Amino acid sequence: AVDSSACRAHEPTPLELAKQRSAIDPLRVPGLYSELFHGRLSDSSAAMSVGGMRLRRHKQFDHTDSGLSGFVLLDDATGHALMVFKGMDRPFAERGSWAGVFTDLGVVLAAKFGTGNSQLPRADDAYTEALCEEAVKSIELVGYSMGSQIANYLAVKYGAHAVVFGDMGLDAALLKIHARGNLEAARKEARDHIVSLSLSGDLVVKAFGVGEVVGTVVNLPGGLNGVFHQPEFYADAANAAIRNRDGVRGRDGERTGQAGT
């Protein structure tokens, strides 16, 4: 067994990097995220059934000073993990009312105006630690809103696979640093590894996006609903896209924004 202390803040080995792969249907991600942070399972330890996986909360990471927050979800049957990076706090609802909101806005503005994102080093440590864990056989990333910056960064730096929505993009300087001298190759790998779910009316993305959208963009139906930059609107749109794709109207009793199966 691997000593857990050896997993902290280290350079991933080739065997660890080989764990990076995609397994989840990207359209299931907004519903999963909404249930995890804002839905009926937000205060529950119950596992979530998504696309044949039973994902339980394996580990939580929360760094109040930088605002970094999220979960490592794990399917015990396969060892596949989803590392979910949380988006911006909501006023009156989360982490100290407005305090968390101001922390998050500070991080977004710092990233947008070139003074750096203080969450990135913390996220880097959390990700490399997860890669090292023996229980984690494979892993992919999920990022919403400001969490999308982190997922984009880790995908470009390490070759991780990710699904992002409410996508804030990636700072051009970070893309250049981790492109290893070949921007076009880095952009191609990012398009191959990142799916970016988009609602055309998301004004927060337009106002606070920090840089280039590096993933392959999938435009969801009902784009104007995105003006409120809420994960539930993305979940509704993604569920509609699933029904359109699969040629069904949805099951009786289907709950708006649910992760699905």
Q: Which role fits each region the language model picked out?
A:
Residues 1-12, 16, 65-68, 79, ...:
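Cys-dependent protein tyrosine phosphatase-like superfamily
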Residues 1-64:
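Long, non-catalytic terminal segments
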Residues 40-140, 161, 168-170, 175-177:
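A conserved cap/lid and substrate-binding interface adjacent to the catalytic center
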Residues 77-80, 135, 160-261:
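Serine hydrolase/lipase
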Residues 142-147, 151:
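Gly/Ala-rich beta-loop-alpha elbow adjacent to hydrolase catalytic centers
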Residues 150-154, 173-176:
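A short acidic (Asp/Glu
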Residues 153-161:
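Short, surface-exposed basic-aromatic patches at helix termini and helix-loop junctions that form
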